[in-house]
Amino acid sequence: MTQARCIRLRSPLWPKRPFNEAYKKLGMLGTGEQKYMPWMQATYLMAANKQALQYLPAGTDLNTITYDQLIEWSKNIAEKTGSPKFGFPAGPKGLKHRFFEGFLYPSYTGSMVTKFRSAEAETAWNKFKELWQYTNPNSTNYAFMQEPLLSGEVWVAFDHVARLADAFNKKPDDFVAFPAPAGPAGRGFMPVVAGVAIPKTSPDMDKAKALVAYMLKPETQIATLKATNFFPVLDVKLPDDMPASVKAFGPAIATMTAAPDARPALLPMGLGDLGGKFNQVYTDSFERIVLGGEDVHGVLGEEAAALKAIIDQSKAPCWAPDKPSAGACPVD
């Protein structure tokens, strides 16, 4: 459904309480009007064993951590314990491509597509190569980071909340959750946002608006969280009977998404059945640069050509964090 076919949603439809402004802006769909209202969210987070906290670099706040601080922290842990304990889901079924698309690239380039082979992108990959020195080598087998966290193989990890939850539910006193790191361009993160819009052809506009207002009530958002593990986009107080993972993730998600340097990156869109090939470009870049040790500049030049071919074939316009485009999203 295009934005031209949806009515403008106005403020009386949602409660007068803090609302995620970054998501509201995304819901304008490139227009000056609220066409789509974010409703619930899931995302990816960082998790750490509390044993790792003693090795944090001086002055580091987990809620505002940067990639440089994460690298220094991981180095400290490796040197003090004698083994690398950062963990990354780089296995065949891991969600590594989402990290590069939605976290690393936006944090260093402010882009996912257009600046794929930029100087800033080269910096991003070189920073990740630094981090990889202190990453558990078994990471190339990991899919769900909750497992190596529980076993103690890994002390600090990145993954989707659904793939971290078991660790927090089984050993709630052992772990902390915190936002993804920030880079020079902001705190890139990839939300999975469910939302609502009202088409102009709705047969009963009043009932449609009433449904939107109901779905955005705090109590409705809490009920949805219990049923689906998708988190509210409103600032709501969670009840005491929630699972340990929800209690840990809720504040971390709220902090990350409302951060002043937040840079949300949407899931790739408009690619049709080429989505898998799009993801493969980021996976191939990781395998060639980080695992294979190939030249960063050369790899990005070659992979950018593959990325451009996919975008041109699908004619997909840009999505956040890239600026809207009239035609296929450019790859500079």
Where are these regions (language model features)?
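Extracytoplasmic "Venus flytrap"/periplasmic binding protein-like
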Residues: 1-22, 54-57, 155-156, 166, ...
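Extracytoplasmic/periplasmic solute-binding protein
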Residues: 30-44, 68-114, 120, 154-155
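Paired acidic/hydrophobic, glycine-rich loop segments that form the ligand-binding mouth/hinge
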Residues: 155-160, 176
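Hinge/lid segment of periplasmic solute-binding proteins
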Residues: 1-43, 69-71, 176-178
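Glycine-centered hinge/linker elements that transmit conformational signals in sensory
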Residues: 72-77, 113-141, 180
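Extracytoplasmic/periplasmic substrate-recognition and gating elements
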Residues: 129-136, 169-232, 266, 284
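Short helix-initiation/N-cap motifs at beta->coil->alpha
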Residues: 65-69, 138-150
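Long, aromatic- and glycine/proline-rich binding clefts that accommodate carbohydrate-like moieties
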Residues: 227-288, 316-332
